[in-house]
Amino acid sequence: LLRLFCFAIISQVPFMLFDSMFTNNFSFNIFGTLFVGLLAILLYDKISNCTFELTKDKKFNLTINKIFGFVPAILLGIISEVCYFDYGFWGVAIIFLFYFFKNDKLGMVIFYITACIIKYGINIIIYGYHYLYILLCIGTILPIIFIYLYNGKQGKKIKYLLYAFYPVHLLILYFVFK
């Protein structure tokens, strides 16, 4: 959690420089969204696994704890949307969704594809049809193939290289195109 927070801070300036070529709007980078998504997962686990008892029925208490576990995820998603985190509520919801379905890959794929179609379908309803929404929907759905095929084994230990890639490539693109 701390590592994601630190990389969110480090990556913010390169992100703002790159983003300034396209818009004057302020937003937080993807590491901020990943940080908030992980925080939502940690809070969900903490709340849903707590031993808070409303009644003597353990199954009922467990169900209530799980339901209350969703509250921080929803609130953090709303905060992400209001505070202009990259991908906003959608980003936090998808991170949480992947965690929630971590042991059910087929369920994850079905839910994710359905969520993508609904998201871009709503955009078409609100803003009118544009082929770009179809391309965005397809581009959003395609990565689920790689997620589905992931075998759960850690790859080469190049974690910090991958972390560094994000701000470095944004700076390179900024200086090349500015």
Language model segments and positions:
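Alpha-helical transmembrane segments and their immediate juxtamembrane cytosolic regions
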Residues: 1-178
